[in-house]
Regions:
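DE-rich acidic low-complexity regions and acidic surface loops
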Residues: 1-228
Length: 228
């Protein structure tokens, strides 16, 4: 027997609520990013721009986006300030039509919603009442590697930062050794690409030894610098 959710394709709809990017029927997409201050939603025309009339394509993609945004707000239970970056539309009538489409799409939402007009920068601000923690808040945790930033420093940048910290520790009184416990890729970079810089620190500080310790259980950007 086919599960009921699978039969009506509900599983795929639930899964879409966990994705940063949601595809639109025309080939465009919406990208949803939540921050401490607000939720930003960007409309991307992508493949939809292959149509002949760019203005009409932008208008139709924005209409699709308005429907999908209203749906995603309910699915994810997003609240607070929401800023939508619609694809630029020149005719004012198109802007008003998209605003009205969004207002119509959110009418069935039980949360209280306020919607502004599209600004001359193509941005629409709206607010949605917080009824409960959002889907992201209740089912996600902060990434232990990047601490929620979404990016980590590259090996070169991180290695240079560690070198500066090693020298700071080496300058302190009564320091005999400085141990840098680092991820394997960082250790490889320091010992191969920056060996001369490590040796220079030892030379400048006289009796201080710098020991690079690779740790295969550690990932960038994490490291530890200890003086002995």
């Amino acid at each position: 027997e086919i599960p009921l959710f699978s039969h009506y394709q509900i599983e795929s709809q639930i899964e879409s609520a966990f994705q940063r990017e949601v595809r639109l029927p025309s080939g465009g997409s919406i990208v949803i990013d939540s921050t401490e201050a607000l939720t930003a939603i960007d409309i991307n025309s992508a493949r939809a721009t292959r149509g002949g009339d760019i203005e009409e394509t932008a208008f139709n993609t924005n209409l699709e986006a308005a429907d999908e945004i209203a749906r995603q707000l309910r699915l994810r239970d997003l609240g607070g300030l929401i800023v939508i970056d619609f694809i630029d539309m020149t005719p004012v009538r198109h802007q008003r039509a998209v605003e009205n489409r969004l207002r119509e799409a959110v009418r069935q939402d039980r949360a209280r919603i306020q919607i502004s007009h599209i600004s001359r920068f193509g941005l629409l601000e709206m607010s949605r009442q917080r009824l409960s923690p959002s889907l992201g808040e209740s089912s996600h945790h902060v990434c232990p590697r990047c601490s929620g930033t979404g990016t980590v420093r590259d090996n070169e940048s991180l290695s240079l930062s560690i070198l500066r910290l090693i020298e700071e520790e080496a300058l302190k009184e009564n320091t005999k050794e400085v141990h840098a416990i680092v991820p394997v890729p960082i250790a490889s970079y320091l010992l191969n690409e920056k060996r001369a810089a490590v040796s220079a620190i030892e030379s400048r500080q006289g009796d201080v030894r710098v020991i690079i310790v690779p740790n295969d259980e550690m990932q960038t950007p994490h490291y530890s610098v200890l003086r002995v």
